[in-house]
Amino acid sequence: MGALSLASSTFAQTWIWYPGDYEIWLGNQMNNRRTERGAFFPPFWKTDSHYVVVEFSKQLNLSEPEEIFIAAEGKYNVKLDGKLQFGMPETMTLPAGKHSLNIKVWNQATPPTIYVKGKTVNSDSSWRVTYEDKEWIDESGKASDTSATVYMDAGCWNFDGATQRPSQFTLLREPHQAISKTEQPEGGTLYDFGKETFGYITLKNLSGKGHIAIFYGESPEEAKDKEFCETLDKLFVESGQVTDLAIRSTSPLNDSANEYTLENSKAFRYVYITHEPGVQIGEVSMQYEYLPEEYRGSFRCNDEELNRIWEVSAYTMHLTTREFFIDGIKRDRWVWSGDAIQSYLMNYYLFFDNESVKRTIWLLRGKDPVTSHSNTIMDYTFYWFLSVYDYYMYSGDRHFVNQLYLRMQTMMDYVLGRTNKNGMVEGLSGDWVFVDWADGYLDKKGELSFEQILFCRSLETMALCADLIGDSDGKQKYDKLASALKAKLKPTFWNTQKQAFVHNSVNGRQSDAVTRYANMFSVFFQYLDDKKQAFCPFKRQYPEDYHSLYAFL
């Protein structure tokens, strides 16, 4: 019931849930593990949650009676052809013929999920789900129709056994030993685990009474900098039990080895441990935590340094591929849309793990109502739209687009509601206009050419997705908006003398600054004709390989 195999499903049945709900719930678990020097540090953007009541339904046509097994995470009822069954049946026999099977689950703590197994009746993504069936019963006892109910296809991953409950999912772990242990002249012990890693420190043969301090670092200097290292833990040992002082959690020592593993994971190479004289620590090791992945991409050449760069890059990518694609293992460990879109592109060549891409896209979108940009950052909202475009182009997964489309529409409605009189976006109150961690001053005022180009591509993405799901009115709407915005890009931002897009326009006046951002993406998206591309400063710098560079931005 803990860590599960992540191979593709080979079973007919699987645990199912409302699409996006499990991903949002799981993401909340991960995003709220961040600490700043022992202090809990939750995200500063809106945190959504799962629907607490979900109905699962399936239309059946059975050639013979069939017994089914039912499991659920939550309190549930079962209706067959509109009639409630007694209690919460674990098994029931369905008669032959056409029937409607409905299972409604309530769970306040974790997403409502179900697992149904029979000869032909099995829970999978073909089941329909809703968070409000809108079925009421009038004074005569007649039930209303549910024609106003919005149903979705069920969400699932690969929890294919009855005991593989989604809420119990954890990443895999394996024990790793430090490659060296060095007593320090100023006191304490420095442990080197050989390379950057991620997991949980384990203390063995732990006894006595007193405080233990654990400091983490990418270098010996950082780990030993007790006042300024990014991450640390503090423990108190007494009477065969350990209290983690950061999270106020007390646990007994495990088994005869008097072993204790910290509950909070950390990223590190070096670990520096000090303790009071009354405490004895035997061995220090770690439990390495990871998402198992199949390496589908590889690289090898006659330059060993380049080979090593590839190996380190692939390992780094794997470290940040966890329940979701995260920005980095050390500090934030959050899901940021700008970091995620880069991870998606690298993933398509290294792992081609589409499930992790979809989980991350669901989490970053969250739920309605939309009250801010993704991660509060304007450009990150547009990266979110672009990530859907890229995912479809690499996977051809039309079903995912169909599932996500309503939330794409409401996200774009939010953006369109914040455009100015020119139909362009500019930073408003509450918006973080990010662009880049740039050296020196980077003007964020007015209409930024970079933001308009991302906005235009997002509108084109909406038109593509509308066409994929058969929304002809939507396609016409978004095509018109994209064309109108695209037609304004050159008149507003193109500087003939510089042969480039300038950085921004304030009150209708072009700035003198030329930055790489708009010019790069205009080349990637082929928004410039051949002549302008030839003169574009970015194209001049990368004349041959500019298209391939997009995969690694």
PLM features per residue range, with description:
Residues 53-55, 87, 184-186, 329, ...:
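Short, solvent-exposed coil/turn segments
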Residues 329-331, 335:
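Glycine/proline-enriched, intrinsically flexible loops and inter-domain linkers
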Residues 1-13:
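Bacterial Sec-dependent N-terminal signal peptides
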